[in-house]
Amino acid sequence: MSFKSLHERIQKAVADTGYSKETPIQERAIPRILKGADVIGIAQTGTGKTAAFTLPILSKLTESTEANETRCTRVLIIAPTRELVSQIHENVRTYAKYTNLHTVAIHSAVSDNGQIDKLDSGVDIIIATPGRLLELVERGHGRFSGLKHLVLDEADRMLDMGFIPAIRTICKQLPKSRQSLLFSATMNPQIESLTK
């Protein structure tokens, strides 16, 4: 199977990267995400998991006829480390290069002013570490009323690092009617409960 179910602009960006065949996690996750289903994916690093959630989300945003006139964030991706946030942000920028989608990476290594300006002016996609995002949300930054997709990446690592309370606090700020995607190398009931 190829990436034919994705919007043509996203297909073009994928072709530019040289990928021609979906990995097993992509084969299973992409169709479900495109249909709007919540997904819990068990996948190790290096299996194409980032593309498994970013590609269908970008495709859905690109196909959406709703203009993001309110400049509310439509996608929130939470990851445990600034390195992973930066990597996901780069992947999103690569796959979204033929779209007009706006993204920001939120973590401690980026200046406050740049992050706050982008959050307050509105971006389509936020990729963030939980602690840094919670700090900014508690200071009144970020608009989540139009949020459509929540992704928790490497949820097992976030549990190990003690981020679960921060994630629960952030999730209380989000609309209940959203698509929730959780990816983890392992699964347990505490991790699974994060999507609810």
Question: Can you name each region flagged by the protein language model?
Answer:
Residues 143-196:
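Post-DEXD/H (motif II) to motif III coupling segment of the RecA-like Helicase ATP-binding lobe
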